[in-house]
Amino acid sequence: MSKDSKMRATINQKLTEMGERERLKELLRAKLTECGWRDQLKAHCKDVIKEKGLEHVTVEDLVVEITPKGRVLVPDSVKKELLQRIRAFLAQHAT
């Protein structure tokens, strides 16, 4: 395991143990709903299903098609806020 991987695992463990990971996930869900991200992705899913036909689309197909667009559509302000929260948490709980 690389040094970077170990650090990520440690951070993830600390976020999980302290309950911060769940709080961040809830914040992310709320922010994405608030900015219309979920509605945009839902509409894109419907477009993909219409284009390919319901019988020809699997959940895996949708995930492959939607994931890149979903990542791009997350507003920078949401990304920055989450990153700020993670940094603040780590600064407060640094050992």
Curated annotation (Swiss-Prot):
One of its GO terms (molecular function) is transcription coactivator activity. Keywords: Activator, Chromatin regulator, mRNA transport, Nucleus, Protein transport, Transcription, Transcription regulation, Translocation, Transport. It is found in: Nucleus, Nucleoplasm. InterPro entries: TF_ENY2, TF_EnY2_sf. GO terms for biological process: chromatin organization; mRNA export from nucleus; positive regulation of DNA-templated transcription; protein transport; transcription elongation by RNA polymerase II. Disulfide bonds: none annotated. Pfam families: EnY2 (PF10163). GO terms for cellular component: DUBm complex; nuclear pore; nucleoplasm; SAGA complex; transcription export complex 2. HAMAP family: ENY2_Sus1 (MF_03046). Belongs to the ENY2 family. Involved in mRNA export coupled transcription activation by association with both the TREX-2 and the SAGA complexes. The transcription regulatory histone acetylation (HAT) complex SAGA is a multiprotein complex that activates transcription by remodeling chromatin and mediating histone acetylation and deubiquitination. Within the SAGA complex, participates in a subcomplex that specifically deubiquitinates histones. The SAGA complex is recruited to specific gene promoters by activators, where it is required for transcription. Component of the nuclear pore complex (NPC)-associated TREX-2 complex (transcription and export complex 2). Component of the SAGA transcription coactivator-HAT complex. Within the SAGA complex, participates in a subcomplex of SAGA called the DUB module (deubiquitination module). This is Transcription and mRNA export factor ENY2-2. It comes from Salmo salar (Atlantic salmon). The gene is eny2-2.
